[in-house]
From Swiss-Prot:
Cytoplasm among keywords: yes
Oligomer status and interactors: Homodimer.
Reaction catalysis annotation: N(2)-acetyl-L-ornithine + 2-oxoglutarate = N-acetyl-L-glutamate 5-semialdehyde + L-glutamate
A GO BP entry: L-arginine biosynthetic process
Cofactor: binding details: Binds 1 pyridoxal phosphate per subunit.
Top-rank lineage group of the source organism: Bacteria
Name listed for the protein in its UniProt record: Acetylornithine aminotransferase 1
């Protein structure tokens, strides 16, 4: 029996090795990885640039403390601010921690402005922001809230993509609006074209901060460095993680100078956040993603995946309903349990991940090749053709 806490319904396979877009189990069987560790393995498995960055840094310094300046941390922060709207960065170890830092930054900002009564954060139905007590308080998804009540009474939830509902939900106690540009766990549902712009306008009107949770959408996943670029909207704060480390744990809260003005010494901290190993690897990830032509290639690969999904929907409308999402962050709505379909696809050598009850996520490494996309289509078709007798 495993000594691990039973917090995951783990598949009965041991993944022992990864290379590029492929995973291998204990029996040597290969799996085309269209999950990428849930949008984490930006450059696939074992990318030599990341391996070298980690080895080089490991020979120099693993950990000191955030009580000192750390060159690897300063270098990564500068790369992030040079490439984005942000002026300041706080480093953490995960997406949930990055969102926590974003919430604290917004509340601290309101307090520094002399408005401590503004502490509530407006969030949206079917959102997912992490599994800490604060971040599960920020969602209405009962599957992550169950058993943890009473939760923090600091969030107000309104329907996603309903700008009029958001306007009505703002009160004199509202400090900020927290939203995913594309809901990840919520079924790969994108914000409608005017929704994020409408939220930006509401924040400007009511002197609130706009926080974007780009934990899953960031670092090139949509074909842009961050998904808010698709919408032409400038946030005040974003939470980043997953793809930033390419498989090495790191999170970050990025903010404008004004939004970060309340974060003074002692207001927040992290023992391991921004450690040299994580920052060295994340710097190598950013160098690759920001290299000329990389994001253009991601968009080209995304177009091939779109065409693949259209063919799949035409040939197997008995199983697949529709596709949604952007770039290499795609969701397939299915006429069955998403978890059952994910298990079935795994039997045919394709790794995917569920999003809610009836959506299967396709989140391949951004380095997936045209040949691998063709192989993905072949395996998905074989799996879909074999589904009928199972469902009958």
């Amino acid at each position: 029996m495993s000594a691990l806490m039973n917090t995951y319904a783990r598949a009965n396979i041991d993944i022992v090795r990864g290379e590029g877009c492929w995973l291998y189990d204990q029996d040597g069987r290969d799996y085309l990885d269209l999950a990428a560790g849930v949008a984490v393995n930006t450059l696939g498995h074992g990318d030599p640039r990341l391996v070298q960055a980690l080895k080089t840094q490991a020979d120099i310094l693993w950990h000191a403390s955030n009580l000192y300046r750390l060159p690897a941390q300063e270098a990564l922060a500068t790369k992030l601010t040079d490439a984005t709207f942000a002026d300041r960065v706080f480093f953490a170890n995960s997406g949930a921690e990055a969102v926590e830092a974003a919430i604290k930054t917004a509340r601290r900002w309101q307090g520094a402005k002399g408005r401590p009564e503004r502490y509530r954060v407006l969030t949206f139905g079917n959102a997912f922001h992490g599994r800490t007590l604060a971040t599960i308080s920020a969602t209405d998804q009962m599957k992550v809230r169950e058993g943890f009540t009473p939760l923090y009474d600091a969030f107000d939830t309104t329907p996603f993509n309903d700008i009029e509902g958001a306007a009505r939900a703002i009160t004199p106690q509202t400090a900020a609006i927290l939203v995913e540009p594309i809901q990840g766990e919520g079924g790969l549902t994108p914000a409608t074209p005017g929704f994020l712009a409408g939220l930006r306008a509401l924040c400007d009107q009511h002197d609130l901060l706009l926080i974007l949770d780009e934990v899953q959408t960031g670092i090139g996943r949509t074909g842009h460095l961050f998904a808010h670029e698709l919408y032409g909207v400038r946030p005040d704060i974003i939470a980043v993680a997953k793809g930033l480390g390419g498989g090495f744990p790191i999170g970050a809260c990025l903010a404008t100078e004004d939004a970060a003005s309340g974060m003074t010494p002692g207001s927040h901290g992290s023992t391991y956040g921004g450690n040299p190993l994580a920052c060295a690897v994340a710097s190598a990830v950013l160098d690759a993603v920001l290299a000329p032509g990389f994001l253009e290639t991601v968009r080209e690969r995304a177009a091939l995946v779109d065409a693949l999904l259209e063919r799949l929907l035409r040939r197997h409308s008995d199983l697949f309903v529709r596709a949604q999402g952007h770039g290499l962050m795609r969701g397939l709505q299915v006429r069955a349990s998403a978890r059952d379909v994910v298990a079935h696809l795994r039997d045919f050598g394709v790794m995917t991940v569920a999003a809610g009850a009836d959506v299967v996520r396709l989140l391949p490494p951004l380095t997936i090749s045209e040949l691998e996309i063709a192989e993905a289509e072949a395996r998905l078709l074989r799996a879909a053709e074999a589904w009928l007798p199972i469902a009958a």
